Design a protein with these regions (language model features):
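Active-site-proximal mixed secondary-structure blocks
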Residues: 1-119
Length: 119
């Protein structure tokens, strides 16, 4: 898996398609303790002259506490060929155990962007 940094202001991106149909991964935590979850909802826009992604996460989700205890989280977008991996990330909770090995087997590798884990 290779990473490609894209500038959303230059990308022809349909947020309804990318978020609602292709899904995204929300990832929070730090290098040693992180979790990722699939989301098919969210909002992209501009607030106070800053580009934003707004996500609503239930307090019962394992990722919620990691988002609350860290200043940032990442949003990763994928093509349809990663559907199996995203489906797994949306159905298996990090509360149940470390799901990161299975995530790797499915072709997703975590990387750090600054202090934030991302896929």
């Amino acid at each position: 898996m290779s990473f490609e940094k894209i500038t959303l202001t230059e990308e022809n991106l349909n947020p309804f398609e990318k978020i609602g149909k292709d899904w995204v991964l929300l990832t929070a935590g730090d290098e040693n303790n992180y979790n990722t979850m699939t989301a098919s909802w969210g909002t992209m826009g501009v607030m106070w002259n800053k580009n934003i992604f707004m996500a609503v996460v239930r307090p019962s989700r394992f990722t919620y506490s990691l988002m609350e205890n860290n200043d940032t989280f990442s949003v990763s977008m994928f093509g349809k060929n990663y559907r199996e991996a995203l489906s797994f990330c949306g159905s298996y909770s990090g509360k149940e155990g470390d799901k990161n090995e299975k995530v790797k087997e499915l072709g997703l590798n975590m990387t750090m962007i600054g202090d934030t884990p991302a896929f």
